[in-house]
Amino acid sequence: SFSAFTNVRQALDMAAAEDVRIVGINDFYSMDGYREWNDECAARHLYPMFNIEFISLNSEDQAAGLRVNDPNNPGRTYLSGKGLAYPVILSGKEAQMLADVRAESNAQVERMCAKLNAHLDAVKAGFSIDFKQVVKDLTRGSVRERHLAKALRMAVDAAAGNAGDRLALYERIFGGQPLKSAIENDAAVENEIRSKLLKSGGAAFVPEDPKAFLPMETVCRIIEAAGGIPTYPFLADDAKGNFTDFEGDLQKAADTLKKRGFKSVEFITTRNTTAVLEKYTDYLQDEGFIVTFGSEHNTPALEPIRLRTRDNAEGLSEKLRLTNYRGACAVAAHQAGLDSVKAGDELLQKTVFGI
């Protein structure tokens, strides 16, 4: 849908250069990248994993005003699928539900583009954004608001010949507010465009339609039909040390996840401190959950692939490295139709490490 990478090859070249040998693709509502991921991993002797991500809605949590893993929207819950089958096996009713939710997600961004063009016309920007061209040039079929931000930044670059002219044009587009980002920092400029125009309160903001969010149970069913493991992504501690309503009581969160049928959880390690990650992952492993880690690349900023924590740029602690590998073994085993972490370890040792 959107990433900092120019293409799959760049992402995997970075992984190989950083000595990351087990690599997973993860995209919103899409498995379209699986073939290229598989083939390019093979060319670099990397082990591919196949994942997917959804935004779901839990009506019970929404009614209770409970923030789960979206800190701003009670009941809205991000879910991942780990170790999906490749070649893709999803078909029938579940495949149609996935196609429908992806189409609605794209339609919401198309409505946003129309509103953005109305704003550009009102401020006499001198150009507009061609939605079909954005989809063709900047996406593989899944379009997000970040693509609109990138398209607008590129349009301003094309319309204004020098830095001073671009700054003046941004000030007009932003309703008299000057651009705060350095004009040469494309990633920062795109983030500012998104924040000022496309998010809530912005001139081109369009709220997401409830149709874009499937019930949690339906998402889990789609993931299982695709051969994957339904997985709950923990936010855990934010930069101020705060937790969401759902995650603050770890024991209660684990019990609720079990009742809802989850056996797998994941963390994006750069979001959290080492101490919190170790505490949460130790507890969740003891409770029988598969625990996996991942990196985050859904902004314009190009970040390393090798895992690290918020308070340790050098990498993971030895305890977290072992947790990470154990989780990778569990997912690799599932993906290969094997039945244990040990079998996954043997598979990875043989195929990745040549042991």
Stretches with model-predicted labels:
Residues 87-172:
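Non-catalytic, alpha-helical, charged scaffold/linker segments
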Residues 36-42, 143-155, 176-190, 210-220:
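Short, charge-rich amphipathic segments
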Residues 1-76, 192-226, 232-302, 311, ...:
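An N-terminally biased module of ancient metal coordination in phosphate/nucleic-acid-related enzymes
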Residues 65-95:
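A basic- and aromatic-enriched beta-loop-alpha substructure that forms the phosphate/nucleotide-
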Residues 305-307:
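Active-site-adjacent pocket scaffolds in enzyme catalytic domains
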